[in-house]
Structures are given as structure tokens and as C-alpha cells.
Amino acid sequence: MIKKYVALAALVTAVSFSAIAQVAQYALPNFTDADCEAKTINLKVKDQYRNLCTAAGINSTAINNYLGTIGGALQLTFPNAKQPDKKLYEQAEKPADITLIYRLKYTANLPLRKVINALTATGLFVYAEPNYIMQKCYTVNDASLGNQYYIGQLKADQAWDVWKGDTNMVIGITDSGVDTNHVDLKPNIKYNYNDPYNGIDDDGDGYIDNRRGWNIWANNDNVYDAQDSHGTFTTGISSAKTDNGIGVAGIGFKCKFLPVRLDDNVGNYIRAYDAVVYAADHGCKVINCSWGSRFPSNFGVDIINYAVINKDAVVIASAGNDNNQEPFYPASFQYVINVAGLNQSNQKSPTSSWGANIDIVAYGSGIYNTYNPNTYVTSGGTSAAAPMVSGAAALLRSYYPTWKALKVAEQLKVTADPAFYSVPQNLQYATKLGKGRLDVLKALTDTTSPSIAMLNKAAKDNNDRNFLPGDTLRLTGLFKNYIRPATNGVVTLTCTSPYATIINNTFSLGNLNQNDTISNTSNPFKVILANNTPVNTPLEFKFAITADGGYNVLEWMADTVNRNRMNIDVGNVVLTVPSNGSVGFTNPYATPGAGFSYKDYGSLFYTSGFMVGEAAGPKVMDNVYATPPNYDADWGQVNPVRRRAIDVT
């Protein structure tokens, strides 16, 4: 008797076609054309095809023939980038190789999804993604609250009695540009004296006359956008000239800033991640990102990892102004300090996002600061909160010049003040606004607390990755202490869901010195899923990390169990079978699911699905593209797809 596995997809059926067909089509829920730069795609070539890559393009007949049909042109996005030092791969935090990233622009009247599909099918690329347009995390003006109350609340003024920063410490302001003639900003610009205005690239960095920053979109030194004051506003918070008897005070005090303009000429934040690379490459050890998007991307992950791991820069980003728990990027990427906002009463700012991804809070309401042209205004948003942390990071980094970026980030988080959680209006956000409110003084002066982070988080079952009712999940991670020694460290797992029973909820870390790591792979946390777990149940796991001296910090892991899709994993081949008539991925934008993949080549297609046709009609039932970006939804789920063993004799 032979056992054979069969994937059963329960689909809506009926006697006549007219009874089943759902005529309505729907736009893709993940992004629209307005969310992306038109006819532009970010591509990363797989390392095994490095020999095909040149500064001018990719030496592939198939790729070049396709580019010819779509009027496409490739450009190496970061031509000055170098491959990471091999030693960086030996540490817990892995570097990013951005040397094989290209940007494709095409002229044909084709939707992004169709071009991405064709490129993905070649198997040459790690990823092919839209170039998402970022949004600034800014709220409207409120002229009745003009003051700098946050300086005292964050104890920045007391911190200045300890340390006032250093002019060699530079904050990269990746934003809409800066009013370089603003009386409160001009003195703190970091000038590149090695490249005077003479039409020559004197310093050989690939940029001509980049004396005071760079305009990434226009590829020139015009870093001022008279129509958009966002960058001028955020810059003043971190970097305004302090103790000069006029205007406002920047938290970074003596620390300088480098303006890196990322918008086009009509206000679209279209070269945001490119700006991060420029800042990192030009010596900025702190980089502020008061912008973001609800769309994650592999391109974004690469850039953040490059800045933090390869270039040792602290990256700070706004949590977003959507007043929800949805992740916002780059703030929610690993290694970024994710900053939410409070109002003057220490309540969560009405617009600030919140959630398990938040690291720290600062102030995002009633912020009085610099504005175009050479003036001041009161405004807010998490755009304002992020540069407060950036200014503090610059102070701290210059105070401890040998500290690495991640150590600085952990010190800022571990010294944050959690007292604001006691404000009644904040009780509903318990643990979801980070470790606490930025405390600049304590960040400079605390010499006792360790800081343990959980890296490489993973959830596994019986290796089919389906997480079904009755399964036992094994949750693992690598725990690293970034700062001072920790004694008697313990990790305790909790989950509030009634469908998760934890049978191994603690792991002993023992004693960890600075930079020590320990993994629980051999002794994982174990969680049993209830037999009555509903379909697509979200679970949120909370890891409380404690150590002697009152140290206590939270880490989170979230996943969806009993999904309405199934991974069929046989040898080197993985296929995801959803319950809605699609194949490979549940949704038309290649998520969620593994697609149809072989070894480490990634999915061999972008979208696929079952189709039934009636020649006499002619009519077709399917869940694939109609006229992009519209997508047919003719099939529906009766029961979730499941795997079962049957006897074949």
C-alpha cells in the first residue's frame, strides 16, 4: 500500500456558469499606481549571476531582448558601492550587498505588475519591486502652541550640562531639502570643503560640487525646496544652532547636519532609500527618516542593513500618522529606531501610529521650529518626534565615540522613561508605545543597564510550515546583549490567545557580557495550537526579557496560524496552494505564499491560478488578472485547503 499526499482545494461550484461567476473585479489591495514611481522597478541580481553585471546593464540576451520590447533602460543604482567586508558576515547582524541593485525605467504602456512578473520569471533576480513613494509624517500647523516644551520634558537641557555634542558628528537629514539660508540652520550645515564650487568632482566621490549635501532626484547640489518646508522643519528639531540667542535650539547642540534631498520637483518622496545610502556613504553616523510607507520592500531592507551594518549608522524613522497598529516602513524594519509621538500632556498623539514595532516615543504635537523661508512655525506629527531621537543619538554617539550604531540605539531605548504609560489615556496602548519616552540625560549618564535584543526570530512546526490545529510550534531566536553585563537573564513567553497553549515558556540566558549571544534553538519555546483554532488566526507572542537589577524589556513575534493556504514541500520544491483558486500565492501581488520555488532560486512565477473555460460563451472562470490592475475573483472558498493522506493501491 502506497501513501500519497493530495492537496484538496474546496472551491465554489454550481450547475450553471451564470450562477457562480462573480462579475465584479477589484483593484489590488496592496498598492495602486499612485503609491509607486511610474514605470520604475528596483531589481537585485542574484549573486551567482554577478559575472553578467556591468555598470551599463546586464549581459543577458533574454533580459536585453525583453528590455527592447518595453523600451526599458537599466542603471546601476549605487555604482560607487563596494561588496561588504567578509568579516561582517561572521557576526549576528548580517550586512547587505547593494552592488547588484539596478533601477529599471521603461516607456511601454504596461502595468508594473506585468513587467515585474516577466522579470521574476527569468530567475535572475533576488527581487523585482515597485519603487514606492514615501509619505512625510507631518500634521497641519497649530499656531497656538508655539514653544519648545519638549526640550525640558526630554531632559535635553540637563543633558547639555553633561555634553554638548561635537561638530564632527553629522546627522543625515534625508528629507525634502533644507532652507540653507535659514539663520538658525546655516551655521550647523556640514560643509564638504574638499569639493568647492568649480564644476569638478574634486574629492572623487562621484558627485560634482556636493559642498553642502545633495539632491538625489535632480543629481545636483540644490537641496532647497521652497514649496516644501518639511525638511526645514525636521532639521531644526535635531540640528538648529543652539545657544545663539535667536530662534530655537536643536537637541544635537554642536552636532552638524547634512541635507540630502529626496523629493522630485512636485513633492513626491521618490528617492528616499537612495538618500539613506548617500548619507551613509558620506559619513553620517546618524540618519533621520521622517517619512515612510505602509509597503515593506526587500530593497528597503537592503538599504537599511547597508546603512546600519555595513556603514555603522544609527537610523531613526517615524512610526507614521495613521493612528493604527499597521507597520510603517522603514521604521518597522529591524535595526531602525521606530519613533511614535506624544502630545504635550504625555498622551499618545491623536495621529501617531502604535504597536509592537514601536521602540521609543518623543513628542509629536505642538512643536515650534524652523520653516521656509527663514521663519518658524508650530506643527507636529511623528516627523517631529523622530529628529528628537536623532539629535539625542548624535549627542550620545559623540559622547561615546567608540560605540557602534546598534549599541547607541540600544542605549537610547533601554534608558527611555516608561512613566508616561501611567497616563490614563495611554492604558489602551500598554506596551505598544515602545520602552518609554526619550530621556536624553539618562542616555548620556546611565552606566548600569544591559540591553538584550532577540534576533533571528523564527517559528517552526513539523517542517511543513503550515501551522495547523494540533501542531506544536517551536519558537526560537538569538539573544544578544549589546551593552553592559547582564546576570541571571531569563526570557518568559506569553500569549493571550485562547488557541495557543504554551508548554515551555521560559529560557535561561544565564550571564551575558557585552556582545555575548545565546540561542534557544536546542531548547525552543513550545506552543500547541488548539484543535478548534479558526482559519487565519493571528497570534502575537510576547517575550519578556529580565535580568538582575530590575532590567525588563519586551520583544514580540507575530504570525498567522491555520492559514487558508498550504505549503507542499517535497525535496527541493515548494508549492503554495491557497483556498481561493490561486496557485503559488493567495494574492495577485505575490504574497502571501512561497509561490512555486526550486532550491534557493525563489518562485518561478509571479501569479497563477486555476481556470475553467466554456468555449460556447466564450466564458472563463479564474482568479487571475483581467485588465491590470484589476483581478478576477470568480472562485471562492468553501473550506480551507488541507493536506491528507490517501491510500493508492
Predicted region positions:
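Hydrolase catalytic cores
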Residues: 235-238, 258-265, 285-289, 312-313, ...
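Extended, loop-rich substrate-binding clefts of extracytoplasmic carbohydrate-active enzymes
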Residues: 612-649
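Protease zymogen maturation seam
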Residues: 83-103, 114-170, 176-189, 295
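Substrate-binding/specificity loop regions of serine endopeptidase catalytic domains
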Residues: 137-140, 214, 218, 223, ...
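Autoinhibitory N-terminal propeptides
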Residues: 12, 16-92, 124-139, 155-157
